[in-house]
Amino acid sequence: MTNQKISRDVHHLAHRMSGFQESSRIVPEEAPIAMSYNGTTQAVMMATPGDLEDFAIGFSLTENIVTRIEEIEALDIVAFESGIDIQMKLAKQPEQRLSARRRFMAGPVGCGLCGIDSIEQALRPLHPLEECSTTFTTRDIAAAVASLGAAQALNAKTHATHGAGFFRPGEGLFAVREDIGRHNALDKLIGAVAREGLLAEEGIVAITSRVSVEMVQKAVMLGVPVLAAISAPTALAIRTAEAANLTLVALVRDEEFDIYTHCGRIIES
C-alpha cells in the first residue's frame, strides 16, 4: 500500500480587475492508474490517486472481471515514478471474463468505454434489477443530491472533481468518493459499498455529472434501484435504464427534478 497526495498547492499568475498578481490555488492530482490481474495489466486510467482500493474493487466488479469481492485474493498498490500499479491476485483467474473485457489502451479522463474492443462489449447486456417494494420520497432525492455536494471535500478546495455518493433514507450519506473522472468516482463508490457489504437496494446513488450509458451500467451492476444526477441523461442512458428496471432521476434541483424511468419508486414527501 502507498499514500498518495490527491491535491497540490500551485502558484500562478492571476489577472484580476486591478491587473496581474501573484496567486496560488489548490488543484487535484492526476496520475495513470494501472489495473493488473495475476501479473497482466488489464487497463490504465487517468484518475485522482485516492481511495485506490475502492477504485480497484469497484472497477473489477463493474467490468465483470469478478462477480464477488472474495474473488480478489490479494491487492497491492505499488507506486512508480510514472504512475501507480494496482496489482490484484485472483483466487481463480476468470480468463473468460478477462478476455471479454480486455482493454489494452489507456483511457483518458471522462472516458468510460475507451479501449473496449467491440460495440457488443460497450453495450453489453445487463441483468434487469429485481422488482422490489422499496420506495423513496421526493425529499430523499433532494437530500441525496444536496448532501453529496456539501460532502465533497476535495471539490470544495479545487472546484475540479466529480462526486458519487450512496444515500440511505433516514441515515443520510454512507460514503462519498471523488475523482477527476465521473466514471472513476462511481467505481470508487461502488468499491466502498461492496467492501462494507451494504445492501444496495436500500439506497440511492447520487452523482454530480450527466448520465451517460456507462453510469447507468455501473449503477445496475451495483444493484441500486435509483440513480439521481445533477445533470441530464442521454437517450441511450434512458433506454438502458428502462430495460434494466433502474429508476433514473436527473436535473435535480432541490425537490424539483425529472424522472425518466420506473417512476413508481418515487413518491411525494
UniProtKB/Swiss-Prot annotation:
GO molecular function: sulfur carrier activity; sulfurtransferase activity
Keywords for this protein: Cytoplasm, Molybdenum cofactor biosynthesis
GO process annotations (BP): Mo-molybdopterin cofactor biosynthetic process
Signal peptide interval: none
Protein name (database record): Sulfur carrier protein FdhD
Gene3D superfamilies, A to Z: 3.10.20.10, Cytidine Deaminase, domain 2
Intracellular or extracellular location(s): Cytoplasm
Source organism (scientific name): Brucella abortus biovar 1 (strain 9-941)
Catalytic residues as annotated in Swiss-Prot or TrEMBL: C111
Transmembrane segments: none
Gene designation per UniProt: fdhD
InterPro entries: Cytidine_deaminase-like, FdhD
Pfam families named among the record's database cross-references: FdhD-NarQ (PF02634)
Gene Ontology cellular component terms for the protein in this record: cytoplasm
Primary location: cytoplasm
Protein family according to the UniProt entry: Belongs to the FdhD family.
Function: Required for formate dehydrogenase (FDH) activity. Acts as a sulfur carrier protein that transfers sulfur from IscS to the molybdenum cofactor prior to its insertion into FDH.
